[in-house]
């Protein structure tokens, strides 16, 4: 258990953050915490995860969080754009205030990491192997295919598409479908295979989305890294970590 004094941010992530939750969805939480002095100087990151029947909690070392923001990965951004965000330490609040700049500070890496996640989900889906993930098993057993992974492919591809369409100004609406009833219904229909599509039909469906993000690659890759924003992230997190360490030594 992480000492409350070492916690920087708490938030709800996963389907509740993207607006794609239903009455069967459990709650995913992420807690960003500061390292102890020993962890800091040993270089050891103490990330860990606890899984309960209705709630999963991931503890994220703030140094890992910093790297995920500088690389502009979905895993980092979902904390900034999550649901029910609680900034426990105000020294970290400038990060949240500047989240829109952070979301576009490394667009090439955002594209590569997100499209890579989509491709891994595609490989998992097309393998037709029963997934290890307990959340996906329910859908595999019901439909004889991992339709939860299929929805994730569509969601990741749509996020890249919508963010580019907004000219990289509105990650919130690109990432979260809470206020988009049509988009939300579409995603949940994919997950629940409302159209009763065969596996082969869903593979072709996934290929369409994978092809659509291939077209976006140049649009993302032509942007350079925003070193000023990267430096800002580093400065805020390093200072907040130092202050926390002094207060709680």
Explain the meaning of each model-derived region.
Residues 93-238, 247:
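Conserved nucleotidyltransferase catalytic core and NTase-mimicking acidic/glycine-rich helix/loop elements
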Residues 18-52, 153:
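Catalytic metal-binding acidic patch
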Residues 36, 72, 163:
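Phosphate/oxyanion-binding loops and surfaces in catalytic or ligand/nucleic-acid-binding neighborhoods
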Residues 1-16:
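Helical scaffold of the NTase/Pol beta-like nucleotidyltransferase catalytic core
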Residues 28, 66, 148-150:
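Extracellular structured ligand-interaction cores
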